[in-house]
């Protein structure tokens, strides 16, 4: 005969999210004591998590949030797409975004040792282990990033494919342009620029592109070669530089012209301060 009630079993499952069999085991081992059973399952989760650490994690989700605390983005990976869409896993990821915002964290290893937003009695790493036990798969926090909150900035976040790709755009100069920033983030997910502007293209990337172009037009007069290189570089910049790209919602204008228009209308100097594009596994 069990030494615990069905109500205690139900409470343990609600508190931990662990399966019925393991909850019964925990309560049996702890003589029906709910608090001790929770501790038992946490220890069990840490032990079982270490056995899963070697498993590949190619699926996952990217989540981001911006509020008065700043802006945070995280990528968390699991083994299967099924678990990537699991409610318990998604809740862990959402809580992790809160952890980054609360702790202003920008380093995964440091964040793992800090108290979790979802359960202050656990570190982020301990909660990760408990969640691994619940979903039955390895969970890896691949990367995080935190942007401090500053005045006169607008932040736009766009998520695509249920968190498979997420872009963040930060505009400086105005604090009421979240809608524009989000539209630019949507453009970024679709157009996938590599750099902000022509000036931000690294010298080695530019040299490599010139080398590729030159190899395709050998045997022509130098003046012709220079003209062709100039034209092809213009196309290259339009492909890889955000400000040079045709705006996806209005291809007749570029992102730079779009920003210039907002600056002119508002009387403020508006610029794309920063953007990022994260894709699962990229």
From Swiss-Prot:
GO molecular function, one term: translation elongation factor activity
Cellular localization per UniProt: Cytoplasm
Keywords, in A-Z order: Cytoplasm, Elongation factor, Protein biosynthesis
GO cellular component: a single term: cytoplasm
Pfam assignment, any one: EF_TS
Gene3D superfamilies per the UniProt record, alphabetical: 1.10.286.20, DNA helicase RuvA subunit, C-terminal domain, Elongation factor Ts, dimerisation domain
Entries under InterPro entries matching the protein: EF-Ts_dimer_sf, Transl_elong_EFTs/EF1B, Transl_elong_EFTs/EF1B_dimer, Transl_elong_Ts_CS, UBA-like_sf
CDD domains xrefs: UBA_EF-Ts
Superkingdom as given in the UniProt entry: Bacteria
Location of region: Involved in Mg(2+) ion dislocation from EF-Tu: 80-83
SUPFAM superfamilies: Elongation factor Ts (EF-Ts), dimerisation domain, UBA-like
Main location: cytoplasm
PANTHER family, A to Z: ELONGATION FACTOR TS (PTHR11741), ELONGATION FACTOR TS, MITOCHONDRIAL (PTHR11741:SF0)
Its biological purpose: Associates with the EF-Tu.GDP complex and induces the exchange of GDP to GTP. It remains bound to the aminoacyl-tRNA.EF-Tu.GTP complex up to the GTP hydrolysis stage on the ribosome.
HAMAP family associated with the record: EF_Ts
Sequence similarity: Belongs to the EF-Ts family.
Name of protein: Elongation factor Ts
Organism the protein comes from: Chlamydia felis (strain Fe/C-56)
């Amino acid at each position: 005969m069990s030494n615990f009630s069905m109500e205690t079993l139900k409470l343990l499952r609600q508190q931990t999210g662990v399966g019925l069999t393991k909850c019964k085991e925990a309560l049996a081992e702890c003589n029906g004591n709910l608090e001790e059973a929770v501790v038992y399952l946490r220890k069990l989760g840490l032990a079982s998590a270490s056995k899963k650490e070697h498993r590949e994690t190619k699926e996952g989700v990217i989540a981001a949030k911006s509020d008065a605390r700043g802006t945070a983005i995280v990528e968390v990976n699991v083994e299967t797409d099924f678990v990537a869409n699991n409610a318990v896993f998604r809740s862990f990821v959402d809580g992790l975004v809160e952890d980054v915002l609360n702790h202003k964290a920008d380093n995964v290893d440091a964040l793992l040792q800090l108290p979790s937003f979802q359960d202050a009695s656990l570190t982020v790493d301990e909660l990760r282990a408990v969640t691994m036990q619940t979903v039955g798969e390895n969970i890896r926090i691949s990367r995080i990033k935190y942007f401090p909150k500053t005045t006169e900035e607008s932040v736009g976040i766009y998520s695509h494919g249920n968190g498979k790709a997420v872009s963040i755009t930060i505009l400086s100069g105005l604090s009421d342009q979240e809608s524009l920033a989000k539209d630019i983030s949507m453009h970024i997910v679709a157009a996938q620029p590599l750099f902000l502007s022509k000036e931000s293209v690294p010298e080695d990337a530019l040299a490599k592109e010139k080398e590729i172009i030159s190899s395709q037009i050998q045997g022509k007069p130098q003046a012709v070669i220079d003209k062709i290189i100039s034209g092809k570089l213009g196309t290259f910049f339009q492909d890889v530089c955000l400000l040079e790209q045709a705006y996806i919602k209005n291809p007749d204008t570029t992102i730079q012209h779009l920003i210039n228009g907002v600056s002119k209308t508002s009387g403020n100097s508006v610029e794309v301060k920063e953007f990022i594009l994260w894709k699962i596994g990229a």
